[in-house]
Amino acid sequence: MTPTVPELEFAQATAFESNVPPLFPGRAGPDDGADRLRLRLAVRGWARPLDLIAASNSPDDVMAILGALAAEVETAVQTRPNQWYLSLAARKRELARRDDAQLRAAASASVPGDDDDPVLHAMRIALADAEPTLSALGTDVLAALGNACDWLGERWRHAVGAQRIAGELASRALDADLRRMTRDPMVGRSHRDTLARLIGFATAATQTPLSVAYVYGGGGAGKTTLLSFLQRDLSQRAEPVPVVRIDFDEPAIDPTRMVTLNIALVEQLARSVPAVCDRASDMLPALRDTALVQHDAGLSRGGPRKRIKSSRPESMLKAESVASQAASDEGSILYRLLAPDVVAGPILIVFDTAELVLAQSDHVASSLVSWLGFLHNEAGARDLRLVIAGRDPPDDPDLGHAANSLLSRLKDTGARIETPIGLPELDPAEAQQLLRNCGVDDPTAAAEAAAAVPGNPLLLRITADALLQGEAELRESVRRAHRDSRIDADSARNYLLRRVVAHVRDPIARPYVLAATYSPVVTAKLLEEVVIPAVDRSEREPGPGIPANKKAATAKAKRVFDALASTYWLTRQTLRSETVPFNREIRAFALKLLAATPEGALLERDVRQSAAIHHLRRRSADDRALALYHLAVLGHPYTVPRDLASVQTVLRDVIEELPADLRNRLAPPVGSVAPGVARGVARSSIDDMSDSDWQRYLEGDERSKRAGEGAQMVKADRAREALDLYLARPTRPPGLPPTFVIQAQADLGEWDEGIADIDAILEREADDWLARKSIGPEALSRIYWITRLALQAYGRLSTPHAMLLRNASETATGPGLSTLPALIAVAETMSGEPIMAGRMRSQALKTDAAGRTLLCPIHGHLPETIELFDAGIAVVQSDWRQRMIQLAPARLIRANEAHLRDLQSRLDALHAKPIAQVNQLFNKMRTGIAVEPTTMAGLNSAVLLLRGLTPEFYRPLREALLALCENGVASPMMRHAVDPLFERMSIRPAEMEPATFYRRLSNNPNAWCTAFIVYADRCRLLPGLCESLARYADSPKSRRIASSFLAWDKALCRGTSSDWGQPAKTRK
């Protein structure tokens, strides 16, 4: 915050108090004084500016000095009156322009308050020659030292860097947290027995690479405390067991992006494993760069009602390329990190509150299993122990599907699965012990509370707080409730706020969470017409958030609904995007606590009466069942529908809340839950889902922007699994599959399987696309994939297909202008006929498709100048710059001489380095190079500058290689095709050394076949590989894919080839 005028006036009035000697001798004016004040602030934290201004300045000069810096500082009038803190940008500028002597002089000047300034202390350490001893520094100074490392940048002089400092801070925070959580002895015989079992699980000898234990209990059951005791015990052993805790409640953790899990793994192991700590300073920046690239490519997790970004066509190629390279890049970074010679003994990994992510999608469970496989195959882990802390019992037929799905997948990989362990409530004696540990010394009060309050450890701790910390009147109210064997209202409210409401991230939605639980399932309409008005009526004064009109009310209800839908701890995902069911156990406990509050009874009656009216006005079977439920609970007359089966289905989770006579009528068990409002993915399977639910699950829901399981699988490079899932139960007529199936076919190189009939798709859907004013993203994606499949499979387009693209190129806006040109350019070069409209062509010349567009000889007029990015021009060969000098226009070489020399130097430096560095370099290359197409001397010059990469073939060619190796063992045919390319890679990363490559291939064939294809493309060697495959491969599929690539390359190179040939410079 900028200093106020009164602060400046105060500074002027008291300026004479300052007696600081000047840094440099001589009388200084206001400008010099401001400069000196800025320097002194740059090496300090919060400081009084008056203490830092020389006493020789006049009041007018002081006022001018303070005014000159007013915009560069932060203030906190309430908490730090008359103190300033130099802003980050101003601080970095000031530190950068000063030499070390000036900074030391500014830091050595002593003024009041300096002894307590952690920033000044840290800056003195940073500027000193002596290496700091981190363990000897206070936590506040250590944190400031981490900031100083960032502020000084390349001028940081010590071997101990930001990563070591951050690791020390994290270790201290963890130690403090463990001390807090384990301060009192563990209470509860079952809890102690479970701890003993988990310690034995984590330390016992085993021959199994992966062992799994599942611990479950409701909110507040003590799982976090149990895990803290476990981690403390393992860390204090003579041979400590390192623990990696993956907390799915952390926003940075995305289980579908392996890199986020790997970052957490390295960060935590660096604190306890010296060998990992030594490598962390290199690994973590590389992993974070990889994470940033994946995020920019749209590979972040999408919520249940949020379309996954990379399903939009404009980011598909980027996302596809980045996702394909992720496993090999991260394998390159973390290679053998967890091998027995690095980490001796077992490693314990904890998945905390697994339901937070498992409930989102079956795809998440598969991603987590894949990550554990990666740790074994690439990181070299040979003894992993996994503890999964969950909420729901895996054997519960209604709630346990998510946990059971993960455990089943783990078992299929050969993991040893321990018997799941449940944490029960504490019995009254144990509850009394917990209350005594919390400070409730009165045995009568402890006994009364233990008898009245459920044995949930968190609720008991909250009760202890109420008994100890409240006013006398509150304490007496609590005691009175306990004597009456009731839960006291204060503890009930606090638990609900801390364990239920707090889980909902959106603050706008939180006031309505508890009222919504009176219905077992909510819709946006129910929230709008029932829940939100009931809560707002219960407030004494209308809040500012109450909508003023129908449109605002609908928008608010939708926001609350989305917040509930994304709170997986509290609700279950449903295939019907318009409904959200609550978790049965959590809802039942919440209602029990709400009943203990006086306001709960009033709110319940209001909500239930309004909900009954809401459902009676509707005619569906679900509404009739829910109206019956609310009327029965209120004690009002009700009529039981004749169709008892539908009522049993909807009310299955709430049958215990009904009056005895109605409960008896509905008591017959339901063999399976039909698709109703309370039915979610967690209780569904291929066999028992309705056709509509299965289609929503597989394809998603465009109206609610919910991504389908199939699209998520293909996006994550699991095309085979997605295709098999669809073929097990198709959702559309033969020949007309959803888009993700077409993409899966294209990726797998299975182009003639009779699954997608492109002519039938065009006949059925093209007229509808062309009739629209603009083509939406989903239609555009479909057009893209049928075009790509047609060009790869057949090398041509039918007349209706070409006409569709011609019309689309004339009307496309937004993403279409950047998505289709790369494919249309291929189609034009193959057919010799113009397709792309001038408007799209002009736009394409500003995108990554510019090179292909210019290679097409059909369009006569060439622009005077276009700008190409260096990442698209550069070829990873040691003679690339030499060929550029020989073939590229002389003016281009002169204008970019220094950059080309630097770029070749950086390419040469990749030799023998991890392959991850190749992609990291190219991901950062975004320098524009101006090209004059009319000056290109012939076809060789054009191909060198414009050909670029062919990411459309990375996955199909990967499949072509996989067909030539079994269980990671390359066949002689594969070696015959691949080995010559190693010799022609004049810059060869470590993993492209033949012996290393084949060893890595045996551990992870998918990842390293992909890595080979991508790197060969960067070296312009794919044509040679495909020539060999097309001629000699014994797999028809491999020959077909290779021939298709050669046809593309020949068309784009106007009858020639883009193959680099034998480099002029080779390296051994």
Curated annotation (Swiss-Prot):
ATP binds at residues 217-224. InterPro entries: P-loop_NTPase (IPR027417). Its EC number is 3.6.4.-. One of its GO terms (molecular function) is hydrolase activity. One of its GO terms (biological process) is defense response to virus. It is an enzyme of class 3 (hydrolase). Keywords: Antiviral defense, ATP-binding, Hydrolase, Nucleotide-binding. Involved in defense against bacteriophages. When this probable 4 gene operon (bGSDM-FE772_23060-FE772_23065-FE772_23070) is inserted into E.coli it provides nearly 100-fold protection against phages T5 and T6 and about 8-fold against phage T4. The operon without bGSDM no longer protects against phage. Probably a nucleotide hydrolase, possibly of ATP. This is Probable ATPase FE772_23070.
